[in-house]
Amino acid sequence: MCGIVGAVAQRDVAEILVQGLRRLEYRGYDSAGVAVVDSDKQLTRLRRLGKVQELADAVEAAQVAGGTGIAHTRWATHGEPSEINAHPHISGDITVVHNGIIENHEMLRTMLQDRGYVFTSQTDTEVIAHLVEWELRSASSLLEAVQTTVKQLTGAYGTVVMDRNDPSRLVVARSGSPIVIGFGIGENFLASDQLALLNVTRRFMYLEEGDVAEMTRRDVRVFDALGQPVQREISESNLEHDAADKGHYRHYMQKEIFEQPKALINTMEGRITHDCVVVESIGVHAAEILAKVEHVQIVACGTSYNAGMTARYWFESLAGVSCDVEIASEFRYRKFVTRPNSLLITLSQSGETADTLAALRLAKEKGYMAAMTICNVAGSSLVRESDFAFMTRAGTEIGVASTKAFTTQLVTLLMLVTALGKQQQRIGRELEAEIVHALHQLPKQIETALSFEKQIETLAEDFADKHHTLFLGRGEYYPIAVEASLKLKEISYIHAEAYAAGELKHGPLALIDADMPVVVVAPSNELLEKLKSNIEEVRARGGLLYVFADEVAGFEADETMKIIAMPHVSEIVAPIYYTIPMQLLSYHVALIKGTDVDQPRNLAKAVTVE
């Protein structure tokens, strides 16, 4: 959720650190700070509440110099957003930044206070700084002091430690919060996300759970949780250097909405032919595993959970395999029964979602036949810890409100469903060809849906002064309605809820009045007539109806109901297609309201703490 950047170089690194923080702004934060030490052991620390730009201005004004440094953007967990609580934190000659939550910080704080340490902040991070300072008194090196310190910590952390008396190195530890090391020429870097470092290196190494690493200009040494030296794989990043550039778009979210046709094409490339799904593209042993699957368990959070809810309909109606979908933070604390030959699927854009990772680790102890992840970040923790990964190829998604990651997850899930049904001979060649044809057509159809932006922009004016909105859908369009309500509440701060339309009379009808917009997802399918009855229930109570309807569905607009006629598409991919106007609606409502579209208040892109 927070962002970390570190560097050891011959050149001044303050600008590199601040630029790295800029590239991590999408993760969400409330304050930022930087600390740099020079060859004369002079330490400069600057912290600011608010945007990274305020920190950048302070760094420029102070003319910060030095070749070793760490920087951080904070998203408050312990202690209010303030300059005092902002990182880095200092204890004597030790400076620390930290992502995560130290669960036993109160006990450690009491112990350290008994030793005479005075705390200046409300954060859990400050206990790390004091602990390292204490351990360094008897340790032979900073590395040893950090190794001893992390053994005393309970919780999640990605933490970097700098010693003013030894400006040639940084020591970093990782448990439950991602850290990547970037390799330069005569200089090395680290960050919580490789995106922060793409302007200085393309060669990266991800630390594993429990790793502690010592980084100098010329060398990186990694030790596992037992203190044994280990080698971790170094790989070349294929992320685009300009991924953090908005181009001509006003916001990252708008850019990412319009990148969806290309993202879907990239996600399908090499995985479908003109008439079939290439099962081998899912994984080396995918054909063998999918042939044995009797049950699918999907675990995810937020938007990824909504993608899983949509896929449940496909697994059961197309592939004939039972499927359960559960929120990761609930799944991991529930006593559950693992069904025979059950495949676990985790969904995550970042691959670092704390609850989803914890659910995966729990599930691996519970007898699932295999653990698969659908993820957008190669090298992430979910990818490394799963048995196999089916990657989305959405490209870097910076807007906090997920758009292209969601639709590429849906396309990936539909390809997986087709492969599973094919391997179990429940999807024949004719149906497989129909699904694949629909997938091939989808990018062009989404381009058509994007052309509705002006119409939806006008429609958005009706929502901007409302306090509540209700979304309705039936069948596989109910999760699409849920996702639409999530988008609206995330970025416009309008309270929005979604219901299966058949549930209206079981409570939500009590909310309907002339100030409650009701948005309906209305494709032409076997539930259309029942959906029309639900719409009439809203109409009879004076509700404001906005119906996104298939052009062949037979709706007619009047003073109580506005119709957005959507071109007819294959029923198989229609849930993906109807997502697009919902994204545009949320975006333009937020735009009218003047909210921070890309960085909504209180939210972060990657939720790496529980």
UniProtKB/Swiss-Prot annotation:
GO process terms (BP): carbohydrate metabolic process; fructose 6-phosphate metabolic process; protein N-linked glycosylation; UDP-N-acetylglucosamine metabolic process
Glutamine amidotransferase type-2 domain residues: 2-218
Subcellular location(s) per record: Cytoplasm
Reactions that this protein is recorded to catalyse: D-fructose 6-phosphate + L-glutamine = D-glucosamine 6-phosphate + L-glutamate
Active site: 2 (nucleophile), 605 (for fru-6p isomerization activity)
Primary location recorded for the protein, binned into one broad class: cytoplasm
A GO term from the CC aspect: cytosol
A Pfam family this chain is assigned to: SIS
Source organism superkingdom: Bacteria
Enzyme Commission number(s) from the entry: 2.6.1.16
GO molecular function, one term: glutamine-fructose-6-phosphate transaminase (isomerizing) activity
UniProt signal peptide: none
UniProt function note: Catalyzes the first step in hexosamine metabolism, converting fructose-6P into glucosamine-6P using glutamine as a nitrogen source.
Name of the protein this chain belongs to: Glutamine--fructose-6-phosphate aminotransferase [isomerizing]
Organism: Vibrio cholerae serotype O1 (strain ATCC 39315 / El Tor Inaba N16961)
Gene that this polypeptide is encoded by: glmS
